[in-house]
Amino acid sequence: MGRKPCCSKEGMNRGAWASMEDKILVTYIKTHGEGKWRSLPKRAGLKRCGKSCRLRWLNYLRPGIKRGNISEDEEDLIIRLHNLLGNRWSLIAGRLPGRTDNEIKNYWNTNLGRRVHDQSHQHCRPNPTITSTKPADAPPANANTVATMPVRTKAARCTRAFFSDDLSDQKEVAANNDGLDNKKEEFDAVGSIGPLLQENVGNAVGEDTNIDMAVSLDSLLLFDSFQVDDGINLQSMAALLDSEDQWF
């Protein structure tokens, strides 16, 4: 068996309340007090349902109801209470003086509920991952890793040879040293035949001539074109020695 309805719903006014109906309801409640909502319409002379009379009084006509828009502080309090209590609007309204449960429920369904849902959905949304365009086998950009990587050289074919100036200078110095060695050998050869030349020159001149054969190496180096020959001419050698005496 279900609960008995408060009225038969026949011949009842529906829709917006008129100002005369509000005045009759307020006067009756002030005289007899709240309660007994099933029999109140009949005793007050209203063609309204008992439930409709109760909601009209609690949500609009009772004293102490706060009129106007809900402030930001009240919004924050409603959000926190809803997180704790859920959709228990009567308990939430009991902690907001001057606000009715019906008003808070309507404000939540039209404004706060959608806003809180969008904020929570935005916070729970994962950040999109940025795909990297680097190849899979690319080494990481690390100085230590790059330093330890092996260096692979590419084979190249040598088509030309280049000699630096230092190499040319070394060749020139070696050539000069070879020339000095050759001059020294020539000087030693001349020194070994010195006594023979002195004797032959003395016989050719016809007098006892004492010729100093101590020819220096520096003097022989002045003659770049001088070369020792096996068939040397004694007369030309004597002329050469005379020129040596004139120098000294």
UniProtKB/Swiss-Prot annotation:
Localization per record: Nucleus
Keywords: Activator, DNA-binding, Nucleus, Repeat, Transcription, Transcription regulation
Every HTH myb-type domain range: 9-61, 62-116
InterPro entries: Homeodomain-like_sf (IPR009057), Myb_dom (IPR017930), Myb_TF_plants (IPR015495), SANT/Myb (IPR001005)
Cellular-component GO terms for this entry: nucleus
Pfam families xrefs: Myb_DNA-binding
Keyword Membrane: no
Gene3D superfamilies with a match to the protein in the record: Homeodomain-like
GO molecular function annotations of the record: DNA binding
Regions that span the bilayer: none
Function, as annotated: Transcription activator involved in the spatiotemporal regulation of flavonoid biosynthesis specifically in the corms of Montbretia. Activates the promoters of enzymes involved in the biosynthesis of the flavonol kaempferol and the flavonol-glycoside kaempferol-rhamnoside.
Protein name, as recorded: Transcription factor MYB1
Source species of the chain: Crocosmia x crocosmiiflora
